C-alpha cells in the first residue's frame, strides 16, 4: 500500500502538514462541533465581518486533511550481463521472463524494466512499464559483447527504482541480477569521470570488487528494495562473486548455470511474493 494526501481511498483523517490537498469535511466538522456555541456567542457579542452570515464556525485549528491509501505494484528490474559468450542466452532468457511476468502482472499493477550492461556502461533499455508492446519493441535492439560494467548497472537500477517509487505507482522494487558477478569496468569510467583503460591494461581486481560490494550495499539499504542474484557462472570452481554481491545487498542468491526464462520467471515471482507477504 502507498499512503498519500491526494490519491487513493480515504482511510482516515489527520492533522494537515502544510497545504491541505484533500479536506476531510467529516473530521473537520467533528473537530469544530464542541466549539460552535461559544464561537457563536463570541460573534454575537463582538461581530467580525469574516464570520457574518455563517451558521457553522470553522477555525484553522479544526481543519483536518484526508489520508489516502492505494494499492501499489512492484517494479521488477532485470539487470542482465550482456557481455561475454553467453550474453545472448542470458538476454533471451531475461526477455522471455520479462514478457511472461508482464502477461500475468495486469491485476497486480507490477511493472518491469530491463538494464543490460556491456561495453563501458549500462543502459536502461526498457524503462519501467506495463506495456508488452513497448517491451517487445525495445528488446529488438539488444547489443551484446564487450566489457562488464556491473557496478554501473546496479547504480542505475537503484536510480531507476527510486524514481519509480517517487512517482507513487510503485511500492516495492526487486532487482533481478542475471550474470556471474564479474566486473571489469570501474564505475568512474562508466560515469565518464575517468578515461577508459588502455588496451591490454587490466583493472585492479580488488578495487573493482570493493566498488561492486559497496554499490550492492547501497542498493540493499534503500527502503523497499530487494536483490535477487541469479548466478550464471558455469565454471567447475566458482569465484563466489555473485554470492558476495547478494550477501552485501542482503538479497537472495540462486545458482542458475543453465539460464532459462521459466526458471527466471518462477524465482522472480517468488521474490516478489516474499516482499509482498
Residue ranges and their predicted role:
Residues 138-147:
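A glycine-rich helix N-cap at a beta->alpha junction
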Residues 85-87, 137, 185:
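Short small-residue beta-strand/loop micro-motif enriched in glycine and branched aliphatics
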Residues 62-63, 97, 153-156, 211-214:
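Well-ordered alpha-helical segments embedded in enzymatic catalytic cores
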Residues 29, 68-128, 144, 151-156, ...:
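Von Willebrand factor
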Residues 182:
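Catalytic metal-binding/acid-base residues of hydrolase active sites
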Residues 159-171, 185, 189-277:
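Von Willebrand factor type A / integrin I
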Residues 1-73:
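Acidic/polar low-complexity segments with low predicted structural confidence
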Residues 132-136:
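Short, basic/glycine-rich phosphate-binding loops at helix/coil junctions
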